[in-house]
């Protein structure tokens, strides 16, 4: 590892979107000296445009289509989405997904503890308060983790000579929030299925509780791998963007 930070390209420098080579001063009809990609494809022909949610369609159809694109084709989405400009719309998109994921995680946590582990022996107001507490804690954790990841990613980018300013990283992480949806749905599905089976015949399913806990632990590991992989897909396709 180098002992000093690498030089970060200037914000207005033109980078090759294929390899990151600085193209300043090269004519549009030439090619990148590093990888051979036509310079024009890193300029007006880069194919980047605002996400549907951001392009004046902040309604349910735009939200759903943008969510589908982020989840189904993350590399393509971040390769074709603009990285500059105001990030308020992206932040609202993230907040909606944090809220949805927090509801799903809170419900999964509630089912896991009160329906599976406690077997409905705890009644009264406590279960409702616990659900609301898990919801608030999850929402705050997702928000805080995003801000921390943005700071660390921008710092790492500067150290390694990547042009990843905080606003660009935040925009990417705000849209990356859509990936919490499949993770939270899987958590809810797993806990709900086991709770439903165990409630029908608690004695018969009691020996399988250990396997259920193993499965939940495996899901946590797989979710971490999935979230990091999609995070890197976002950063990799944004760090050479020119607009």
Give a label for each model feature.
Residues 3, 46-50, 124-128, 203-207:
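Short hydrophobic/aromatic-rich motifs at helix boundaries and adjacent loops
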Residues 128-243:
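Hydrophobic alpha-helical transmembrane segments and adjacent short intramembrane/lumenal linkers
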Residues 22, 38, 46, 125-127, ...:
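Alpha-helix initiation/capping motif
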Residues 2-100:
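N-terminal juxtamembrane cytosolic/stromal segments of multi-pass membrane proteins
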Residues 46, 115, 186-189:
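Juxtamembrane helix-loop transition sites at the ends of transmembrane segments
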Residues 38, 112, 183-185:
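A generic membrane alpha-helix/interface feature
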Residues 60-142, 154:
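Core alpha-helical transmembrane segments of integral membrane proteins
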Residues 44-45, 105, 197-199:
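Short, surface-exposed, polar/charged, turn-prone segments marking secondary-structure boundaries
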């Amino acid at each position: 590892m180098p002992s000093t930070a690498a030089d970060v390209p200037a914000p207005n420098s033109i980078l090759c979107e294929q390899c990151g080579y600085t193209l300043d001063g090269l004519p549009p009809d030439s090619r990148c000296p590093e990888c051979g990609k036509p310079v024009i494809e890193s300029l007006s022909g880069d194919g980047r445009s605002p996400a549907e949610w951001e392009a004046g369609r902040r309604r349910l159809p735009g939200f759903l289509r943008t969510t589908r694109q982020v989840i189904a084709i993350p590399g393509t989405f971040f390769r074709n989405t603009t990285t500059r400009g105001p990030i308020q719309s992206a932040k609202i998109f993230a907040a909606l997904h944090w809220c949805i994921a927090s509801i799903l995680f809170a419900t999964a946590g509630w089912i896991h503890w009160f329906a599976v582990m406690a077997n409905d022996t705890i009644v009264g107001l406590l279960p409702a308060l616990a659900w609301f507490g898990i919801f608030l804690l999850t929402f705050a954790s997702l928000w805080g983790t995003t801000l921390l990841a943005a700071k660390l990613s921008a710092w790492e980018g500067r150290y390694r000579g990547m042009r990843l300013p905080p606003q660009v990283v935040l925009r990417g992480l705000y849209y990356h929030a859509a990936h919490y949806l499949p993770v939270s749905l899987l958590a809810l599905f797993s806990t709900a299925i086991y709770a439903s089976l165990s409630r029908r015949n608690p004695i018969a399913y009691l020996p399988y509780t250990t396997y259920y806990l193993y499965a939940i632990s495996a899901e946590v590991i797989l979710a971490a791998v999935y979230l990091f992989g999609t995070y890197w897909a976002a950063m990799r396709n944004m760090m050479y963007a020119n607009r």
